[in-house]
Amino acid sequence: MSESAKPRITSGSKFRNEHGFSAIKDGVKRSSSNTEGKSLERKPKWLRARMPGGERYDAVRRNVTEHRLSTVCQESHCPNIGECWTNGTATIMVMGSVCTRACKFCAVDTGNPKGWLDPEEPENTAKSVELMGLRYIVLTSVDRDDLPDGGAAHYAACVSAIKQRTPEVAVEALTPDFDAVMSDVEKVVDSGLDVFAQNVETVKRLTSRVRDPRAGYEKTLSVLAHAKKHRPDVLTKTSLMLGLGETEEEILETMDDLRAIGVDILTLGQYLRPTPNHLPVERYVTPEEFNRYRDIGLEKGFMEVPSGPMVRSSYRADRVFDKNNLGLSVPEVPVPDKAMQIPVKAVD
């Protein structure tokens, strides 16, 4: 087929080719050819999320829209968006909604933002946290390999702005790996956050199949280890998806690797395939297995191990922080009346 005859594919579209997955090409995410002809798997009965709705959910949604925020809840098609937003908690995705990497499990758009950042984002994010009356906020972001520091300074500015406006709010930062440039990692760790998170995503053997080639199992471990070494008082956290073909032995080995570098909190959840062009689910892990892995994780010394089919890395992170085995807690912050009165006009 000639170039002119090929169908036009918009930025971020997923498609297959004979070469399999090849990260980024003109803003297009390519997915593995082994998904050809496969439809989404039928989910077991325990994988059911309630439909989003309610006054608090609508307030959070309006706030996200009016303040031009990207949330991982929306971009990753998270099944828990209804529960989390109804409870007034949200995970805000900073630095835009286009990622420079193309992991094979992820629904977030892939492309080249060409160095663009919203200079108003730190202040808008801080104002939104205040308006929503949150006591715990998770900040995450796309990878920004197009920026010299991977976006570390901008990320740190977002955390600092929240702390300056609402110092009582606990902040968790679920960050990129910043290509393991530790001076950039330190910018975020020193920004005033309470929890530093970087997801290992899968077991070592499956990393090259599941994650973008620029990511890495050892790279993630090195970032988490450095964050803990640089600021021993900060809680460190990571997440592992199950159902991608890993064995129980590999799960336990991953737990041991994480505990060896002092990771405090581990979340375990079922991988759910976003589209037919993403990696297929190899199997659905039962709730009973998730409960057993939680018990094993606690025995290995993790402070907390949220584990279940619907658990995601930032799922009800406020409760995890409250209940961790150190006895640390987030101060109660009353929800202001204005949390339900989201302004129609966007913040300038």
UniProtKB/Swiss-Prot annotation:
Keyword Nucleotide-binding assigned: no
One Gene Ontology cellular component annotation held by this UniProt entry: cytoplasm
Co-factor requirement: [4Fe-4S] cluster
Localization per record: Cytoplasm
Binding positions for [4Fe-4S] cluster 2 per the UniProt entry: 99, 103, 106
Classification via InterPro entries: Aldolase_TIM (IPR013785), Elp3/MiaA/NifB-like_rSAM (IPR006638), Lipoyl_synth (IPR003698), rSAM (IPR007197)
Region (Disordered): 1-45
Record-annotated Radical SAM core domain positions: 85-303
Class of the enzyme per the UniProt entry, highest EC level: transferase
Domain of life (superkingdom): Bacteria
Pathway(s) it belongs to: Protein modification; protein lipoylation via endogenous pathway; protein N(6)-(lipoyl)lysine from octanoyl-[acyl-carrier-protein]: step 2/2
Cofactor binding note: Binds 2 [4Fe-4S] clusters per subunit. One cluster is coordinated with 3 cysteines and an exchangeable S-adenosyl-L-methionine.
Pfam families reported for this sequence: Radical_SAM (PF04055)
Entry's Gene Ontology molecular function annotations: 4 iron, 4 sulfur cluster binding; lipoate synthase activity; metal ion binding
Entry keyword Zinc-finger: no
Record PROSITE patterns: RADICAL_SAM
HAMAP family named in the record: Lipoyl_synth (MF_00206)
Similarity comment: Belongs to the radical SAM superfamily. Lipoyl synthase family.
Protein name as catalogued: Lipoyl synthase
Organism for this UniProt entry: Marinobacter nauticus (strain ATCC 700491 / DSM 11845 / VT8)
